C-alpha cells in the first residue's frame, strides 16, 4: 500500500520528533558550565542596573552549542530568578509605587505573551529590523531626561505615566518576550520621561516589570518551545547572585553615572544586534 502524499512516513515523523526532543540536549563540559554560570552572574547584575544581560548569556549559550531558538528560550527562563533577585534588592526604592506596579504590570504581562508567541511563529528578521531603532530612541530619551524634565516641569504629568506609558510598556513587553536584550533600556527611557521620578526609583520599577516579562514568557516557552534545562539551571544559579550584586552596586550610582551605563549598554546592544 502506498503512502499518502499528504502524510510523512512513520520513520520520518519519528526522526523529526527525536530531533526536536534532542535540540535542548547538548553535552556541556565542566569548564563550559562554569562559563555559563559566570555569564549568568554578569547578566543578573547588569539586568538589575539597567538591562541587556541577554547580550552576554545568549551568545555564550550559542557558543556552547545550543540552537538559536533553544538558547533564547532557555536564556529567558534562566534569567528569571536573577530578575526577581534584583527586584527584591531594590525593594526599598519600590516603596510607595504599588499603584504604578498595579497599573503597568498588566501591560508587561500582555506584551510578554504576544512576544513569546511571535518568537515561535515569526522569523527573527521580521522583528529584529526595528530593534536598533527602538533602542536608539530609548537612549535619546534617557540622555535627554533631565532637559525634558525641566521643560515639562510646568506641565502636569500623570503619576503613573498615563496611557502613553502603558502602551509603551506593552510594546516593550512584546520585545522582551521575543528577545529581551536592552528591554530595560527601553522601559527606563519611557518611564524617565513620562513620569516625574528619581532615576533610581524608576530603575526599581523597571526591575519588577522586566522580571515579570521574563517570567511570563518563560512559562509559556515551557509549553510551546524546546528548553535546555541544564542551561536554565546554570544561568539561574549565576543570575541570582548577580541580581543581588547588581542591586548593591546600582543603587550607589549617581543619576549621571547610571545614565552613562545605560548609554554604553544600549550602544553595545545596537552594535551587536546589527552585526549578528
Question: Can you say where each PLM-predicted feature lies in the sequence?
Answer:
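N-terminal amphipathic/basic-hydrophobic helices that include classical n-h-c signal peptides
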Residues: 1-27
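Lipid-exposed faces of alpha-helical membrane segments in multi-pass integral membrane proteins
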Residues: 34, 38, 42, 81-84, ...
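Hydrophobic alpha-helical transmembrane segments in multi-pass integral membrane proteins
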Residues: 115, 171-179, 217-225, 232, ...
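Membrane-interface alpha-helices at helix entry/exit sites of multi-pass transporters
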Residues: 66-75, 98-103, 196-207
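Selected transmembrane alpha-helices and immediately adjacent juxtamembrane segments
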Residues: 24-67, 154-203, 233
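Selective hydrophobic functional segments
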Residues: 73-127, 133, 214-257
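Transmembrane helix exit motif
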Residues: 84-95, 133-158, 268-276
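Cytoplasmic-side transmembrane-helix entry/capping segments in multi-pass membrane proteins
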Residues: 98-107, 131, 155-161, 203-209, ...
Amino acid at each position: 500500500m502506498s503512502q499518502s502524499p499528504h502524510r510523512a512516513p512513520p520513520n520520518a515523523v519519528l526522526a523529526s520528533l527525536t530531533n526536536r526532543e534532542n535540540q535542548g540536549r547538548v553535552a556541556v563540559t565542566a569548564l563550559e558550565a562554569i562559563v555559563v554560570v559566570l555569564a549568568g552572574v554578569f547578566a543578573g547584575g547588569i539586568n538589575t542596573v539597567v538591562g541587556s544581560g541577554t547580550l552576554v548569556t545568549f551568545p555564550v549559550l550559542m557558543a556552547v552549542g545550543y540552537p538559536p531558538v533553544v538558547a533564547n528560550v532557555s536564556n529567558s527562563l534562566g534569567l528569571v530568578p536573577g530578575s526577581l533577585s534584583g527586584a527584591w534588592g531594590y525593594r526599598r526604592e519600590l516603596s510607595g509605587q504599588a499603584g504604578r506596579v498595579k497599573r503597568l504590570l498588566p501591560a508587561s504581562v500582555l506584551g510578554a505573551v504576544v512576544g513569546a508567541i511571535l518568537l515561535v511563529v515569526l522569523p527573527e528578521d521580521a522583528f529584529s529590523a526595528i530593534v536598533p531603532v527602538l533602542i536608539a530612541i530609548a537612549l535619546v530619551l534617557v540622555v535627554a531626561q533631565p532637559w525634558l524634565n525641566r521643560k515639562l516641569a510646568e506641565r502636569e504629568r500623570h503619576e503613573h505615566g498615563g496611557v502613553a506609558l502603558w502602551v509603551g510598556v506593552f510594546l516593550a513587553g512584546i520585545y522582551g518576550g521575543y528577545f529581551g536584550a536592552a528591554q530595560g533600556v527601553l522601559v527606563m527611557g519611557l518611564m524617565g520621561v513620562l513620569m516625574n521620578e528619581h532615576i533610581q526609583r524608576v530603575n526599581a520599577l523597571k526591575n519588577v516589570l522586566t522580571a515579570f516579562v521574563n517570567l511570563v514568557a518563560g512559562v509559556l516557552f515551557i509549553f510551546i518551545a524546546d528548553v535546555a534545562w541544564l542551561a536554565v539551571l546554570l544561568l539561574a544559579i549565576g543570575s541570582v547572585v548577580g541580581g543581588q550584586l547588581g542591586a548593591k552596586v546600582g543603587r550607589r550610582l549617581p543619576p549621571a553615572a547610571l545614565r552613562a551605563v545605560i548609554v554604553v549598554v544600549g550602544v553595545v546592544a545596537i552594535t551587536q544586534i546589527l552585526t549578528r
